[in-house]
Amino acid sequence: MNPNRNRSGIAWIAALCLSFFAMPAFAQERAYSDGPVTNVTAVKVVDGQFQNYMSYLQKNWKGVMEEAKKAGYVLDYHVYGATPHNPNEADLYLVVTYPNMAMLDGMTEKMEPIQQKVTKMNFREADEASGKRGVMRTLLGEELLRELLLK
């Protein structure tokens, strides 16, 4: 009996067994990677308050977003107008894109100094001002979306 022949047979069987483990790992590779995270806020602007609310967004919200971009907290932001299908749907969307889900951890603590710098209001004053904007708009809700980047 040739001992080399026996070794090559064992090596072949070992290689075959290892290939069974490699195939599931290959098959399990994701076809995408996690991309940026976008927060979409649906807003219903009160009739007659559109210009007032847009002025607020231009004066305060935009400034806060620009500073957040400079700090690296925000990748981009947009304001979208919409044509609602019924009177209870949003007619404005505030869209903010963050680099990743982890960036949302501690976001309030990150944004407070920026908000204070831009608006010259402390947290309590900013919270009160947000409540007063209720005469201009109703916040209908938020949706968090993660972009899935196809490989």
Which residues fall in each region the model found?
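Bacterial N-terminal signal peptides that target proteins for export
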Residues: 2-14
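Short beta-strand/turn micro-motifs at beta-sheet edges
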Residues: 27-31, 80-83
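An amphipathic, aromatic/His-enriched active-site/gating alpha helix that lines ligand/cofactor pockets
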Residues: 29-32, 63, 67-75, 95-145
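Acidic/histidine-rich, surface-exposed loop or edge segments in extracytoplasmic proteins
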Residues: 33-48, 92
